[in-house]
């Protein structure tokens, strides 16, 4: 199941992302965050990844935002 959820992210990383300049505001890119969240939390990791993508905009804070050990849709402040 996790491999099926990760496959579209890997497709994005391999074929779509290289076409655009890097724009992620966080350390651990949003696509890598999504993969780690899925590996750690299963389907809930998809929700965490989508929440992370919504947080990645020009007006957000930058820095480390690692995948938390427990499910959360909020930014992980442990990394700072």
Swiss-Prot record:
The record's listing under Pfam families reads: YidD
Recorded GO cellular component terms are:
plasma membrane
Membrane topology value: Peripheral membrane protein
Where in the sequence does UniProt note compositional bias of the Basic and acidic residues kind?
Answer: 62-80
Q: What name is this protein filed under?
A: Putative membrane protein insertion efficiency factor
Highest taxon, organism lineage: Bacteria
Q: Where in the cell is it found?
A: Cell membrane
Predominant cellular place of this UniProt entry's protein = membrane
Task: Quote the function comment for this protein.
Answer: Could be involved in insertion of integral membrane proteins into the membrane.
Member of which family? Belongs to the UPF0161 family.
The protein's organism comes out as Streptococcus pneumoniae serotype 4 (strain ATCC BAA-334 / TIGR4)
Keyword Nucleotide-binding part of the UniProt annotation: no
Q: Where is this region: Disordered?
A: 60-80
């Amino acid at each position: 199941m996790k491999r099926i959820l990760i496959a579209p992210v890997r497709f994005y990383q391999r074929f779509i992302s290289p076409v655009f300049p890097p724009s992620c505001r966080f350390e651990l890119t949003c696509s890598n965050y999504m993969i780690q969240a899925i590996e750690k939390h299963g389907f809930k990791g998809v929700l965490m990844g989508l929440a992370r993508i919504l947080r990645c905009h020009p007006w957000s804070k930058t820095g480390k935002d690692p995948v938390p050990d427990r499910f959360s849709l909020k930014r992980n402040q442990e990394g700072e």
